Amino acid sequence: MTSSLVGSEMCIRDRYEDKLGTYLMQLSMHDLTPDQAKQTSKFLHTISDFERLGDHAVNISKVAQELHEKSRTFSEAAKYELDVLEQALVEITDLTVNSFVDEDLNTAATVEPLRELIGILCNDLKMRHIKRLRNGQCDLNTGFAFNDLLTNYERIAAHCSNIAVAILELDSSNFDMHEYTKSVRKLKDDRYLSAFEKYEEKYDINGYRPKEETEKRIIEPKEK
């Protein structure tokens, strides 16, 4: 999908959010069954986060379009790191959408550990890219684009976390997203830590090897 197509869909999303938000607010003032009230609450608490996911997609498409138009590219190391991070982004969005559609609490509970890892990866990648800039491996223009991507990726993960928390809190009469998230991050039970460790192993950004080093390892005979 091109940048212009992504941008054109932004107007559609904005209209949908306005219309859905108005409808849900009006609906919430009626006499609803407990299940209907829960569903209405879930939609009201997540609609803005879904809309913001679209906004960040627009931002990312603009960065990609600018890189293409100006024939700029990242270093091989930066490409590798972004590829790993983008795989994590695909998984967290899939987990979020699936848990929302299926109201799957177990899947929703795996979103926050991945969000935390994505935040850590974004910080690590920023520091690595600063080092490459200092070493002359990347130029300043691509450095700005790299940071823009990381900012949007981190925000996408945060909105996914908000949606997952809303799903987990669906059965709670006292909805407090921020307090719940703070509590989860503080306690970090065995299930949380297990999920985090799995993601940490799966999305390891330390696997990159320069082309020259890879070729050398292939050519050199193994020691017996």
Annotate the PLM regions.
Residues 24, 29-31:
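Charged, heptad-repeat coiled-coil alpha-helices that serve as long linker/dimerization "arms"
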Residues 9, 16-24, 36-129, 134, ...:
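Soluble C-terminal extramembrane regulatory/interaction domains of multi-pass membrane proteins
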Residues 137:
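Cytosolic ligand/metal-binding cores
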Residues 109-113, 141-148:
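Membrane-interface "helix-start" segments
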Residues 2, 32-36:
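Short, surface-exposed helix-loop/turn micro-motifs enriched in polar/charged residues
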Residues 117, 144-145, 151, 155, ...:
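Terminal helices and disordered tails flanking the catalytic cores of nucleotide-processing hydrolases
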Residues 1-7, 11-12:
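Single conserved hydrophobic/aromatic residue that forms the stacking wall/gate
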